[in-house]
Each structure stands twice: as C-alpha cells, then as structure tokens.
C-alpha cells in the first residue's frame, strides 16, 4: 500500500484562547490542511490565520455530513468548557475519525478564597440572597435570564458584546470588554463599582483569572458555576499538546509508528 496524501485535513471547533493558539500553530505547519469553525457567538470575531467558517452545522447529522463532504480526517474540539452540547455532538458525529478534546484545567480555590460553588445560574441567582448587593456578572449573555428574576441587586455585566436588552436585569450596567484582564485592571474595576460579590463560571485559563485574585484581596465572595460533567474522550490541556497529538496522527497516516496514547477524562 502507498502512502496517503501528505497533508492531514483537520476541523478545529474553536472560540477559545486555546483554539486561537492552535490555529496559529497549524497555520505554520505544512503537514495540515486546517479549517476553523466558530459558532458565531461573538459578533465581530478577530481574523484568523487559517480558513474559517461561522455558524452551526445543523446538529449531529449536519456535522457528520460536513465531515464527510470536506474529507476531514481529524476533529479537534477546542470549544468552551461550558459548550457541552457541541462536545456531545462532536463525539456523536466523529464516528471512526480521530477526535481530540482541548480543554484548559478548571480553576481551583486557594485557602483564602470565599467561593460558593453552584450547579447552574438559577442556583447562582438564588445564592445572592435577599439583601441588595452590587454584583459583577461575568457569565456570558445566554445566562442572564435567572438574574432578571432577582432584580433587588445592582448588576454590573461584563461581556464581549452588549447583551440583548430583553435579557438584561432592570437597571444593570453594561461593560463591553475582551480579555485578558490584568490584576491591576480587575482591582480597579472592583473598586470603581464597589463590587460586593462576583458571579462567574469555572472557565479556567489565565485570560480572566485575575478577577479571582482581586476578589481574594478584597475578601469578596465569588459564586462559581461548576463545569458540566465531562464525557469520556481523549483530551489535552493546551495547543502545544494538541499539536503533538495531531503530529502523531499525521505520522501514523504516513506509515510511521508514532504512538497515540489515550488520555480519557
């Protein structure tokens, strides 16, 4: 048998810092023919160094059809840790394709932190209690609805794009900003708005972690939505490890014997 094509067609499901880093690595490596797929949550995504598309696939069947029609040979899911449905769709659609999940480690509290873990945003809204508080919401636009049901607090909402007005709690302030945020910036934000509690998701990573350190310094409690249960799929923590995995897939396709060590989580 002869060798197959010298390049490996890769579909990268993105929208995260890790996906952007991996896209840059793939752009510089001639072994791969990558395509980046973005869900379209951000209204004006930054230009990417590899071919890219925006929008959904139409569920599992749509993704399966795309993979077949595009001749994809390896699928890398580097979506947000809370994009559980997309990860499930990727697993269901992959079939016999090589599939890798890139997922940054979750944050873990320090002894001085005052964290309140909750399973969802409904529980987070209830955890704020009845006494009026100044609350910083850094949770994304789709999770705001429960806080409309607890309007007694003053909300400061930080998001990449302005949320839809129908989702915003009455009287809330909107801050549009894109990370990474420095510790100095987060200190200033908490002081300027007299923040008394933060609500966030356990997204992990360094881009928005400084708010946790700033909260620790000021003794501010943080309501933290825990990650959904992770399906069993091969996974790595960053772009560099994903490139190693893709390199091994490419090598095996060329008749090499590079091992693929499963790391199920």
PLM segments and residue spans:
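Conserved N-proximal alpha/beta basic substrate-recognition cap immediately N-terminal to
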Residues: 90
């Amino acid at each position: 048998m002869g060798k197959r094509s010298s390049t490996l067609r890769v579909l990268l499901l993105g929208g995260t810092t890790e996906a952007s880093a991996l896209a840059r690595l793939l752009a510089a490596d001639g072994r791969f023919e990558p395509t980046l797929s973005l869900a379209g949550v951000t209204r004006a995504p930054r230009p990417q160094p590899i071919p890219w598309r925006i929008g959904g696939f139409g569920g599992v069947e749509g993704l399966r059809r795309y993979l077949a029609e595009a001749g994809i040979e390896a699928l890398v899911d580097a979506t947000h840790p809370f994009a559980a449905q997309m990860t499930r769709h990727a697993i269901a659609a992959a079939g016999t394709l090589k599939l890798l999940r890139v997922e940054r480690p979750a944050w873990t509290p320090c002894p001085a932190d005052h964290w309140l873990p909750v399973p969802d945003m409904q529980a987070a809204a209830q955890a704020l209690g009845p006494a009026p508080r100044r609350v910083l919401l850094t949770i994304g636009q789709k999770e705001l609805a429960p806080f409309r049901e607890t309007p007694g607090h003053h909300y400061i909402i930080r998001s990449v794009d302005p949320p839809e007005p129908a989702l915003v709690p009455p009287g809330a302030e909107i801050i549009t900003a894109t990370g990474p945020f420095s510790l100095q910036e987060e200190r200033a934000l908490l002081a300027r708005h007299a923040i008394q509690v933060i609500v966030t998701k356990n997204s992990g990573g360094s881009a928005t972690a400084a708010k946790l350190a700033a909260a620790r310094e000021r003794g501010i409690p943080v309501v933290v939505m825990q990650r959904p249960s992770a399906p069993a799929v091969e996974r790595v923590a960053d772009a560099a490890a994903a490139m190693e995995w893709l390199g091994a897939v490419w090598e095996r396709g060329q008749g090499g014997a590079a091992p693929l060590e499963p790391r199920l989580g």
